[in-house]
Amino acid sequence: GDDNKYFEKIGKTITDITNEIPFEIPATWQWVRLDDICSYIQRGKSPKYSPIKKYPVIAQKCNQWAGFCIDKAQFIDPNSLPSYAEERLLQDGDLMWNSTGLGTLGRMAIYKSALNPYELAVADSHVTVIRPLKAYVLSQYLYYYFASDTVQSVIEDKSAGSTKQKELSTTTVKNYLVPIPPYRKQQRIVEKIKTVTSIMRG
């Protein structure tokens, strides 16, 4: 906006959100609420577990900074599958954000069906599933932003509850402001980070 101020328009209401903006961005970028660039943001649901290894449920321990790990998953009772709406079935590119407890809160991974040998997977109630609108934003770009110190250093402040039971509410996730560059720029940023990361790993 003018004079270095940022405004948000919802319907006819215009609000000054300058104090929410963590840093300046180039003119071709936009600050947007996560909910405006996603088709689905929702906590998973509490599963009914089963020893039958058919439908894995993604818990916080499956989401590591090293990546998504299906090996740590437990399984839901196959008979409970009809209680899951279709949108709750994880899709390629879904971001899975750990939303409960100190030490795990804020950790994120990207769901990849190629790493899941089973037919499908769902998330448990400690994981928030974020489904980006792929025409506008890359999952990998959002992942790198949320993994950055900019977000991770303040994530506990944005959560509620006692120290041991910190909770990142769905409302907080939906309202999170994200700096979005043009699509081609997102692609270049992702490629650059991948290159640097692979060099660092040597």
PLM feature spans:
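Non-catalytic DNA-recognition/assembly elements of restriction-modification systems
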Residues: 15-44, 175, 183-191, 196-202
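Short, well-ordered beta-strand elements within core beta-sheets of diverse protein domains
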Residues: 20-25, 82, 128-134, 174-180
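Extended, domain-scale alpha-helical bundle/helix-rich regions
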Residues: 1-13
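Glutamine-centric residue-chemistry signal
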Residues: 60, 152, 165, 186-187
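Short, ligand-facing micro-motifs at secondary-structure edges
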Residues: 64-76, 95-123, 139-144, 153-159
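Short, conserved charged micro-motifs
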Residues: 136-140, 187
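A short glycine-rich beta-alpha junction/loop motif
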Residues: 119-128, 155, 160-180
